[in-house]
């Protein structure tokens, strides 16, 4: 997908950001509860039920349920699954697994969207490094989400953070996105590309930034369920995401319970202090989801699992065209 020049990036008022913050806090709370619930033996359907309960108790509704026919409240992607894993009573977690949970909520007509990856019990040190590298890349990208920068600065920061962390596969077929009155809107936010390119970032924009990386290659395959995306080589994956408001003071992380203070002390403290947020209990790293672009699969099975037989879309092209693009 290319970002077309005739498409508009939604600009929010400070009051609208306050309303997005309410939705973001629902997501942040739900993810914290889910991360605490992850344990050997629990099913991904159990986690989905917990998410539905927490979102409903807050007076919100799930962003994902029914979206293009998606059948669940969260995406629960285990091990080689990168994104869009459908919760199932038959998918139970085992010690050493890695699960990525993507969660979205709508409150008062505004969306929040985040994701995180956690280990189930003790995990392989290489898996822990994978999770740490992905989360670090998310925060490096968020640090560049500043009015006056270019969208490519965010993408490049994610890319270089992953590159510096090790030999990881950086997923290109799925991207972050603008967010606000709808879950997926302009602009697409790739996790790679040159700095100084793309739309000029302005105060009032909101971005969902969400790197996805693997311990192997970057190629992906969509399974026959039409949703679950897995690594083509069977390697494990991680996914982190946050919804970020661009303010004159810096990035305000709407899906972090402390607004981002713990991770972005130099910029986020200014932005969060301007909003009057107080730091709560230690935050849980939030998560990711991308617009529904489908990867290509030509075979009928992969690692014993049925996959989609034909392409249903195309990845973001990488040219950060758009309003004010260079």
Regions found by a protein language model. Name each.
Residues 1-326:
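Active-site neighborhoods and metal-handling regions in enzymes and metal-associated proteins
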């Amino acid at each position: 997908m290319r970002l077309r020049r005739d498409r508009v990036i939604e600009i929010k008022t400070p009051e609208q950001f306050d309303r997005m913050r309410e939705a973001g806090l629902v997501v942040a709370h739900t993810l914290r509860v889910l991360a605490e619930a992850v344990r050997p033996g629990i099913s991904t359907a159990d986690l989905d039920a917990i998410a539905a309960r927490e979102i409903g108790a807050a007076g919100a509704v799930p962003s994902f349920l029914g979206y293009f026919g998606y059948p669940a409240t969260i995406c629960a992607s285990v091990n080689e699954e990168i994104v869009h894993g459908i919760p199932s009573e038959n998918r139970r977690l085992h010690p050493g697994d890695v699960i990525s949970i993507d969660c979205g909520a709508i409150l008062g007509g505004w969306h929040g969207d985040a994701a995180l990856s956690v280990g189930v019990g003790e995990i392989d040190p290489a898996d822990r490094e994978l999770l740490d590298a992905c989360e670090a890349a998310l925060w490096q990208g968020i640090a560049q989400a500043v009015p006056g920068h270019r969208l490519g600065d965010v993408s490049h920061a994610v890319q270089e953070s992953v590159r510096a962390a090790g030999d990881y596969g950086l997923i290109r077929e799925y991207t972050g996105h603008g967010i606000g009155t709808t879950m997926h809107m302009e602009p697409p936010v790739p996790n790679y590309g040159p700095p100084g390119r793309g739309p000029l970032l302005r105060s009032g924009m909101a971005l969902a930034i969400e790197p996805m990386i693997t311990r192997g290659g970057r190629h992906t395959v969509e399974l026959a369920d039409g949703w679950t995306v897995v690594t083509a080589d069977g390697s494990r994956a991680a996914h982190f995401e946050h919804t970020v408001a661009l303010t004159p003071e810096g990035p305000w992380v709407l899906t972090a319970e402390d607004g981002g203070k713990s991770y972005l002390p130099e910029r986020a403290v200014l932005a969060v202090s301007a909003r009057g947020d107080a730091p709560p209990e230690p935050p849980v790293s939030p998560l990711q989801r991308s617009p529904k672009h489908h990867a290509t699969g030509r075979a009928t099975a992969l690692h014993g699992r049925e996959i989609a037989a034909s392409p249903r879309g195309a990845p973001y092209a990488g040219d950060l065209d758009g309003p004010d693009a260079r």
